[in-house]
Regions:
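Conserved AMP-binding A3 loop
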Residues: 58-85, 92
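Conserved pre-ATP/AMP-binding loop-to-beta segment of ANL
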Residues: 44-62, 95-96
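Conserved S/T- and glycine-rich ATP-binding loop of Class I adenylate-forming
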Residues: 63-66, 99, 114, 144, ...
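Conserved ATP-binding/catalytic segment of the ANL
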Residues: 229-273
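Conserved coil-to-alpha-helix start sites within the AMP-binding
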Residues: 2-23, 102-119
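Gly/Ser/Thr-rich phosphate-binding loop
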Residues: 154-207
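AMP-binding/adenylate-forming
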Residues: 77-82, 98-153
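Conserved ATP-binding loop and adjacent catalytic segment of the adenylate-forming AMP-binding
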Residues: 184-227, 237-241
Length: 273
C-alpha cells in the first residue's frame, strides 16, 4: 500500500494493534481482517486505518458542538501526530506500554487512541465500545481512555490500569470523590474535535495530587473572551484560535478551572443532553 510519508515517518517500530505488529504488512493484514469482520467497531477501525495511511494530508472529522453547532471539519494528520506526542510526554507513556481502546473509532477519542499507539509504539487492544469496558478482558493495562460514564460503571476495575484519562462529559463531585480513592493515576481532560483531543489535563487521583485546575500541554495558551468563555491558542494541533462556550476561571496563560457551559449544553458518553 502507498503510505503517507509523514505518517510513515512517525510509525513507531514497536506499535501493535491486537498483537499485530504495525509495519506495512501488519497494517495491510489488520485492514483486511477488520474490513471482513462482522463487528462494526472493527469495520470502522479499518476505515480509519485506510484514511490514516492514505496520501491525503487531511482527515474529515465530526465535531461534538463544543465551539458551536456540530459540523464536519478537516484536520491535519500532522496535528494529530503532535497531539499524540504531547499526551505521551505529559503522561510519560513508553513504547511497549499496553493500552486499551473501548471508544468508538469513528470519533476523535477513539481515533486518537489508534494514533497514539502508532506514534508512541503502544500495544493497543481493541474491544467493542461498552458501558462496562473492562468486562471483555481480564488483562491489566498501562493506559486507558474512558468516558466518565464508563469509569463510573467500572469503579471496581479501574485499578487494573496504571493511567486513565477521562473525557467527553463533566465529572460530578460525587463521582470525583469516589475516583480519588482508586490507586491509579486518573486525569480529567479538556479538549474537543477542533483541538484533535485534549489540550489540558488535571489530576483526579491519587487523592494527594487532586486538583480542580487544568494545565495546558505543549505550547497551548488560554484566555477569556468578553463573556468569560475560554479562548485557546494551540499551534501544535490547530491553525486558528478556538473560541469555546466554556465559562472558566483563569490561573495564568496555561491553567484554568472549568465552571460550566454558557449554553448549558453538556456531553454524556458522546451524546448531547
Amino acid at each position: 500500500m502507498e503510505m503517507d510519508t509523514l505518517v510513515k515517518d512517525h510509525l513507531h517500530s514497536q506499535a501493535k494493534i491486537n498483537a499485530t505488529p504495525c509495519d506495512e504488512m501488519g497494517i495491510e493484514q489488520l485492514i483486511a481482517t477488520f474490513s471482513e469482520s462482522e463487528e462494526a467497531y472493527l469495520q470502522k477501525t479499518a476505515k480509519f486505518l485506510i484514511e490514516w495511511f492514505s496520501p491525503q494530508e487531511f482527515l474529515s472529522l465530526h465535531t461534538s458542538g463544543t465551539t458551536g453547532t456540530p459540523k464536519q471539519i478537516t484536520v491535519r494528520k500532522e496535528h494529530m501526530i503532535h497531539s499524540a506526542m504531547l499526551t505521551g510526554a505529559f503522561l510519560q507513556l513508553q513504547a511497549g506500554d499496553r493500552a486499551l481502546c473501548v471508544l468508538p473509532t469513528d470519533y476523535i477519542a477513539g481515533k486518537m487512541m489508534l494514533v497514539r499507539a502508532l506514534v508512541l509504539g503502544l500495544s493497543l487492544e481493541l474491544f467493542p465500545p461498552s458501558g462496562t469496558p473492562f468486562a471483555a478482558t481480564s488483562d491489566n493495562f498501562d493506559f486507558v481512555a474512558l468516558t466518565p460514564m464508563q469509569a463510573m460503571k467500572s469503579l471496581g476495575e479501574l485499578h487494573r490500569a496504571k493511567k486513565i484519562i477521562l473525557g467527553g462529559a463533566p465529572i460530578s463531585a460525587a463521582m470525583e470523590a469516589q475516583l480519588q480513592e482508586i490507586p491509579t493515576e486518573i486525569y480529567a481532560t479538556y479538549g474537543m474535535t477542533e483541538t484533535v483531543s485534549h489540550i489540558a489535563l488535571r489530576p483526579i487521583a491519587p487523592k494527594a495530587r487532586h486538583s480542580r485546575i487544568y494545565t495546558t500541554i505543549g505550547k497551548s495558551r488560554v484566555w477569556q473572551d468578553s463573556k468569560g468563555c475560554l479562548v485557546i491558542d494551540c499551534p501544535e494541533v490547530a491553525e486558528e484560535e478556538i473560541h469555546t462556550h466554556d465559562v472558566v476561571r483563569l490561573h495564568g496563560a496555561h491553567a484554568f478551572e472549568w465552571l460550566g457551559r454558557l449554553d448549558n449544553i453538556i456531553n454524556s458518553g458522546g451524546v448531547k443532553i
